[in-house]
Amino acid sequence: MILNWKLLGILVLCLHTRGISGSEDHPSHPPAEDREEAGSPTLPQGPPVPGDPWPGAPPLFEDPPPPHPSPPWRDLPETGVWPPEPPRTDPPQPPRPDDPWPAGPQPPENPWPPAPEVDHRPQEEPDLDPPREEYR
């Protein structure tokens, strides 16, 4: 409880020394920072007007840089050379009828030995639910 009274006393002391009150009887002294910047532009008084820019705000778009004497996109070769010819590529050849693997890289050789023969006959399934003996 003592702590609350101390905080209240500090708050009242701060409010009294800063001159903050509910009435306009005492004009407050401007802080030292405001007195130094007397030449700075004043802030707008009242609510902002829709559409008006905020004072001192930077422009939305910067001005484009000045044009250079020869921009890189204008350094094109002579008109007879443009557009350049694409590199020549041979068209793909149709597969030959006797070619088992027509185009592209050849398949790798199978490194695995052949699998053993598997008996595919149906096996008798074990009875998972054997009959129970009746206890008397």
Curated annotation (Swiss-Prot):
Localization, UniProt: Secreted
Recorded hits in Pfam families, A to Z, give:
SPR1
Give the Pro residues compositional bias ranges.
44-74, 83-116
Q: Where are the transmembrane segments?
A: none
The residues the entry assigns to the signal sequence are 1-22
List every stretch annotated Disordered.
Answer: 20-136
Q: Where is the composition biased (Basic and acidic residues)?
A: 23-33, 117-136
This protein's GO cellular component annotations are:
extracellular region
Keyword annotations for this protein? Secreted, Signal
The question of whether Secreted is a record keyword is answered with: yes
InterPro entries per the record?
Answer: SPR1
Determine if 4Fe-4S is one of this entry's keywords: no
Q: What is this protein called?
A: Psoriasis susceptibility 1 candidate gene 2 protein homolog
Biological source species: Pan troglodytes
Q: What is the lineage of its organism?
A: Eukaryota, Metazoa, Chordata, Craniata, Vertebrata
